From Swiss-Prot:
Record bears the keyword Hydrolase: no
UniProt-listed GO biological process terms: DNA repair; DNA replication
Annotated ranges, domain BRCT: 593-674
A GO molecular-function descriptor: DNA ligase (NAD+) activity
Catalytic activity, as annotated: NAD(+) + (deoxyribonucleotide)n-3'-hydroxyl + 5'-phospho-(deoxyribonucleotide)m = (deoxyribonucleotide)n+m + AMP + beta-nicotinamide D-nucleotide
NCBIfam families: dnlj, PRK07956.1
Gene encoding the protein: ligA
Key words, A-Z: DNA damage, DNA repair, DNA replication, Ligase, Magnesium, Manganese, Metal-binding, NAD, Zinc
Protein name: DNA ligase
UniProt GO cellular component terms: cytosol
Length: 674
């Protein structure tokens, strides 16, 4: 058998696999493999075709899947093509070099590209006749799509009529669903694997009233046979007709700028409300697009630079249980290492007992793991086709694995809790970790490893111990420097960080207590409402002492109020707070309707202040709206001087920076009502 004959056999098998997965993905909206695995199959096929070009005559390019027979077929006036993929910077560079060569461009000629988000949704086309929506269809196999006209009409903000449009107009775009709406949809009893499947399944409903309930969104990206000169002009025209287009779009003739846009959107994708899986580069000049034309599958003038995979398949070796600071028992998947998006994943969240039962997850299974942005990796599905032997169902523990206490499940909750409370060392350690975290007391140098060390030696067993640590070390005559990892500098830095943390704003203080349902956002709302620690504490006591008493604050719901009431009903919590505040200076919050004379200014301190510590002065200044810097520059607005100012004083004079005494600064930070 020749190499080419062998390659043809491999190609036939690859084509069969790809067609099978196309059917599942495009028509049935129930893929069995991840996008990365599918892309790998297509990549293997392209390598063979590149090595044996004559095999192209045996290979028919398919796009998507055949239309769903439940819907009437629609023949596309212009084929709806898919895009070639790039998987690294070099692939993009090759594409840009190739297009310049095909266009016979000189080295000094610029070629502008439109850089757009590749939204992970379902492609669709709409035809307008005489300004009225006439017909909408899916991509289907590129030649024929499914008629989804009535369903598309239910999408919010999609124009049914257009002013000043040509008699015949075809526009194309993407239907998608926001991640939060997808989560809500599944919480209501649906079982979609991901937002893309949810959008595709929703637009293919036989009953348009169901589609209307699904909160679908859309984004238009092209006008078929446009008279516009550029892609940028096309997008502007779509906007003028009332269509939604994507705001995250740039045009550039600079390769590095195009790559920087990719990197920026990749790093920022978790802050976008919908899923994106890459960047599309299109030649901006539409005349040049026509010159380049298309292959049987894709345009020669565009390419999709895919993001690294956020999903992958690996073996679940073991399910372990993690006990958090609120006592919640969280199941964790211990995985065979897998590289997802450049990060090696060995553990992932399984959420709760109900999720394990619903997905029928068992130790030894092969599972789909998803990682999105900074979100904790999670197991989203199980590949049961690889469960070749009978695996035992997972039994959730009836006792806390950390302390042995009984566990319980509250009514109407999926979480299971340890009843050990302060007896459970896992809860204590997690509570302390939360207390010292960045958005709470922000004590640098007290990480998980250090806390465990101090806990085991009985130096920090509760949060009060943090502020008496130096005293305990001295009383017990413990030489920290004799332990591995504890040098004189690290000890001094830690004790200094603890001392500096004793000045804290009200918002961070409330958050540090770890009260259930009181996250950073709610803590800020409470601080801004009550302004001072005294006001807040007094109201919390009223809440605890009178079951009929309540607080009316926008965005603070009954669940949060009941949690605050429960927390302040416990005497040990009151004792802890009262002991804690003896070590602290809690800075009042400033009402949102107040500003100060240093609001928005950059300030620097030098010398020793007589009225407070430097850390307290920094916090007061930041509370008043100033940015506090450690070094002078031409952007510094004020230098505040105390006793024995350093060299910054002379430098400020040479830079003509305004100098304030401590007394004047104290006046400047007072709130002025606006």
């Amino acid at each position: 058998m020749t190499d080419q004959e062998e390659a043809k056999l491999i190609l036939d098998k690859l084509n069969e696999k790809i067609r099978y997965h196309d059917l599942l993905y495009y028509t049935q909206d129930s893929p069995e493999i991840s996008d990365a695995e599918y892309d790998d199959l297509c990549h293997q096929r392209s390598i063979i075709l590149e090595k044996f070009p004559s095999l192209n005559s045996y290979y028919q390019d398919y796009i998507g899947g055949d239309p769903d027979s439940r819907f009437s077929k629609v023949k596309h006036n212009e084929r709806m093509l898919s895009l070639d993929n790039a998987f690294n910077k070099q692939d993009v560079e090759k594409f840009m070099v190739r297009t310049r060569k095909l266009l016979d461009m000189k080295e000094n000629e610029s070629l502008c590209f439109s850089c757009e988000l590749k939204i992970d949704g379902l492609s669709f086309s709409i035809i307008y006749k005489n300004g009225k929506l006439f017909q909408a269809s899916t991509r289907g196999n590129g030649y024929f799509g499914e008629n989804i006209t009535n369903n598309v009409k239910t999408i919010e903000n999609l124009p049914h009529t257009i002013q000043n449009a040509p008699d015949f107009l075809e526009v194309r775009g993407e239907v998608y669903i926001d991640r939060n709406d997808f989560i809500q949809l599944n919480n209501e009893g649906k079982n979609f694997a991901n937002p893309r499947n949810a959008a595709a399944g929703s637009i293919r409903q036989l009953d348009p009233t169901i589609t209307a309930q699904r909160k679908l969104k859309y984004c238009m990206y092209t006008i078929v046979n446009s008279n516009c000169l550029t892609q940028t002009e096309s997008l502007n025209l779509l906007n003028s007709w009332g269509f939604c287009t994507n705001e995250h779009t740039i045009s550039t003739d600079n390769f590095e700028e195009a790559i920087n846009f990719y990197n920026k959107m990749y790093n920022n994708r978790s802050n976008i409300s919908y899923d994106i899986d890459g960047i599309i580069y299109k030649i901006n000049n539409i005349k040049l697009q026509h010159i380049l034309g298309t292959t049987s599958k894709s345009p020669r003038w565009a390419i999709a630079y895919k993001f690294p995979a956020i999903e992958g398949k690996t073996k679940l070796n073991k399910i372990s249980i993690q006990v958090g600071r609120t006592g919640v028992l969280t199941p964790i998947a211990e995985l065979a290492p897998i590289n997802i998006g450049g990060v090696v994943i060995t553990r992932a969240s399984l959420h709760n007992k109900s999720e394990i039962e619903r997905k029928d997850i068992r130790e030894g299974d092969y599972v789909i793991v998803k990682r999105a942005g900074d979100v904790i990796p999670q197991v989203v599905d199980v590949d049961k086709s690889l469960r070749t032997v009978e695996l035992a169902e997972f039994n959730f523990p009836t006792a806390c694995p950390a302390c042995g206490s009984t566990v319980y499940q509250a009514q109407q909750e999926v979480s299971i809790y340890c009843m050990g409370g302060l007896f459970c060392h896992n809860q204590i350690l997690e509570k302390i970790r939360h207390f010292v975290s960045k958005d709470a007391f922000n004590i640098i140098g007290l990480g998980k490893k250090q806390l465990l060390f101090f806990y085991e030696y009985g130096l920090i067993t509760n949060i009060i111990d943090i502020f008496t640590l130096e005293e305990k070390i001295n009383n017990k005559n413990i030489q920290l420097s004799s332990f591995n990892g504890w040098g004189e500098k690290s000890i001094n830095n830690l004790l200094s960080a603890i001392n500096n943390s004793k000045v804290i704003n009200l918002e961070n203080f409330i958050f540090s207590l770890g009260i259930r349902f009181v996250g950073k956002h709610i803590a800020k709302i409470l601080a801004n409402h009550f302004i001072s620690y005294k006001n807040w504490y007094t109201e919390m006591l009223k809440l605890a002492q009178d079951v009929n008493y309540t607080i009316n604050i926008q965005q603070v719901g009954l669940k949060t109020i009941n949690s605050l009431r429960t927390f302040f009903t416990e005497q040990h919590n009151l004792n802890m707070i009262n002991n804690l505040v003896e070590h602290l200076t809690i800075i009042d919050a400033q009402s949102n309707s107040y500003v100060s004379l240093i609001h928005g200014k950059t300030i620097v301190f030098t010398g020793e202040l007589s009225s407070m510590s430097r850390s307290e002065a920094k916090l007061k200044s930041e509370t008043a709206g100033a940015k506090v810097s450690s070094s002078l520059s031409k952007n510094t607005d004020f230098l505040i001087i105390g006793n024995n100012p350093g060299s910054k004083y002379k430098k400020a004079q040479s830079l003509n920076i305004q100098i304030l005494s401590e007394d004047i600064w104290l006046q400047y930070i007072q709130p002025n009502k606006v």
